[in-house]
């Protein structure tokens, strides 16, 4: 009956040799650690990254190596130090559960963009003349598309620390989407000549 079965398992759990046997059977080998570096463009679109791993397979005291190429599925919006796990794809010791493979992600710095969570930050340097007379410029987004920003004279007052927010042009993580923040850095001249003052 149920009471008899429960007592039997309890007795097994109190038996040191049985407990040691179960621990040996269930203890997983140490994980295989891999690291991948990806670009911000890959973060934006998601990607598959191939990695080559070498696992040890120990059976009946004999150890052999096995090499395999795995493909890491990197989701959109992933960040540095996130870990992607391949469960039980690592080292194998007899009948114990296979060890894991842990892949640490590192996102490389971008030449033009920084990230803040899911937001992308683009810094644009402009002159005082651009502030007063208007400015337009193009830039290449991490999606590969070209975007044009046009701020005509008097449309928006650009001041030190001003940020233009473009909704939906940030990174995506599942149903969450960030924005693009364009930060304007104004370069002020040390002095103005007569022509500049008249202009």
What do these predicted ranges mean?
Residues 1-64, 71, 94:
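Post-J-domain flank of DnaJ/Hsp40 co-chaperones
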Residues 53-56, 64-199:
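Intrinsically disordered, low-complexity linker/assembly segments
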């Amino acid at each position: 009956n149920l009471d008899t079965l429960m007592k039997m398992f309890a007795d097994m759990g109190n038996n040191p040799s049985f407990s040691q046997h179960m621990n040996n059977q269930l203890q997983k080998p140490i994980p295989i650690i891999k690291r991948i570096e990806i670009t911000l463009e890959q973060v934006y679109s998601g990607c598959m990254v191939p990695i080559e791993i070498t696992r040890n397979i120990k059976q009946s005291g004999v150890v052999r190596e096995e090499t395999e190429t795995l493909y890491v599925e990197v989701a959109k919006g992933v960040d540095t130090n996130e870990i992607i796990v391949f469960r039980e794809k690592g080292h194998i010791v007899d009948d114990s559960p296979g060890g894991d493979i842990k892949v640490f992600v590192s996102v490389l710095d971008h030449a033009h963009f920084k990230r803040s969570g899911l937001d992308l930050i683009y810094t644009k340097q402009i002159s005082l003349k651009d502030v007063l007379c208007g400015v337009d410029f193009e830039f290449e987004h991490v999606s590969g598309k070209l975007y044009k920003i046009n701020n005509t004279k008097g449309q928006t007052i650009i001041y030190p620390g001003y940020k233009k927010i473009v909704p939906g042009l940030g990174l995506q993580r599942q149903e969450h989407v960030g924005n693009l923040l364009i930060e304007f850095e104004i370069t002020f001249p040390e002095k103005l000549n007569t022509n500049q003052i008249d202009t």
